Curated annotation (Swiss-Prot):
Lineage summary: Bacteria, Pseudomonadati, Myxococcota, Myxococcia, Myxococcales
Signal peptide location: none
Protein name, UniProt field: Putative nickel insertion protein
Source organism per UniProt: Anaeromyxobacter dehalogenans (strain 2CP-C)
Pfam families: Ni_insertion
Keywords assigned by UniProt, alphabetized: Nickel
Family as reported in the entry's similarity comment: Belongs to the LarC family.
HAMAP family for the chain: LarC (MF_01074)
InterPro entries: Ni_insertion (IPR002822)
Amino acid sequence: MALLLLEPVGGIAGDMFLAAAIDLGVDPAALARALESLGVPGWRLAVTRKAEHGIQGTHVDVVVEGEQPASRGLAEILALVAASGLPPRAREAARGIFERIGEAEARVHGVPVSEVHFHEVGAVDSIVDVCGAAVALDLLGWPEVRAAPPELGRGLVRTAHGTMPVPPPAVLELLKGKPVRPGGPPGEAVTPTGAALLAVLAEVGPLPAHVPLRVGYGVGTRAWPDRPNVLRATLAEPAPAAGAGGPGPETLWVLEANLDDCPGQLVARAIEAALEAGALDAWAAPLTMKKGRPGVLLGALCDEARRAAVTGALFAETTTLGVRRHAVEREALERAFEPVETGYGTVRVKVARLGGRELGAHPEYDDCAARARAAGVAVREVMAAALAAYRSRRP
């Protein structure tokens, strides 16, 4: 399967993703034709070449003309998407992105999802950005999207709800469970739309070994003083397998600490903190320590870039006086998220492949749990519906 690797050098926003896709070779005319099926009048795509810190890339501006609604409700936006002529898989992806934004906004503002009204995200340009990203992936043949952890920016930003810290609460809500990097340029480097694209479409973490085929640069609107405001997108294929057709080993770190005086609540928090710091996995297992004391083996798996942060999280959240570490090699299957439409809403299915051959498909638990809570049904019912929807579209 082809890879689409995203590097948010200056951040990520919906227009930057569109621009990077066009710079990779997506036909803007084909993109516009598909988006016209949304039936939303008064906009056009302005595509220009632009240099940023000496890097030539593509800049996209969604030019809005005439009177437009000040905001739109989630139901209104989902109805637009459902009635559109977007390709089926792009329609599913767009629906999933908007639903994820709605859930994040509802949690941040303490209102039911049905009462969420989008201001910035409900504007025509954001609707075009989200649906355009889904159509662009369709035109690229739905490569597996992998993204490097983004820097979120710093400072304050003005929104329709008032002045908020950077990153805004909705951005952090959308990126829960994803590795991110604090700091960055003085401003909003990751927009809610950009965060939603990462949350729904991408696996965020260390980029895999690969063979670059084409490279595109999406240039943003703002100018950062210390870096080019670009999103780099690389269309690639996995690096040649080392051995029996797998993707080849990667070197990771196992971090461990033995605990015999740490309350169970803190152990649970330490696992959570390790994952927030960028650990690929974290766990706790019972063990018997010296003098027959019952204890806990706390462990985490991470890459070199996150080793210091994960170690710091283990020290900060537990009573341990030391953290052991040793390098390990891991071979992992190729993985990609594919959104499917169910009667409960859009759910991502994680698909595992080896050398292009599918070995398994598993509905994403967090998506299923959110849909189950909203519908008042058991999680396993949503999981079964998602798996059935995924299998129904296979040849």
